[in-house]
């Protein structure tokens, strides 16, 4: 996968309700955001009059995605300055390679509570999905797309999913102190019955993978 490291795409403009957010590119605030270190291409989206709110959110989300896709393709045929290799053996192969290391999974909880609080996996709204297993590199390649536009700075953007620090750290320890078996994605739905269903299914997948432990991150 070719990556234009140091580049970001930011969508801006009016959205449903007031959801202001500021990216400090200099000064004290810049120390607390990864985006201050990027060359950001800002896509300003102005809605047409009378557009339905769900259609508005989707249009802005897809505008950012298509822009990132277009820019990313510019790197398709260039020679990389640096190359990083991430090994993702199968569950069976991992047991053979690292029989004495603890088996660890990463449970990635994804926001899924309605308009402005949604996450999409391969285009599917996570509200409609049961927990499932992803290869860690799938998140790096863009499998998880954020639709969160509420409360700037306390939600995971698509950039965070592409550059998930938990996955990166687990890869660094893989084969040394632990056997990183994979990522289990689950949702964060509103109703109690949905929460219980997802929790039970996540626990079942962890048991099925035979993990010794799991790291859980909540959005």
PLM features: residue spans?
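Metallocofactor- and cofactor-centric catalytic cores in central/energy metabolism, strongly enriched
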Residues: 1-213, 218-219
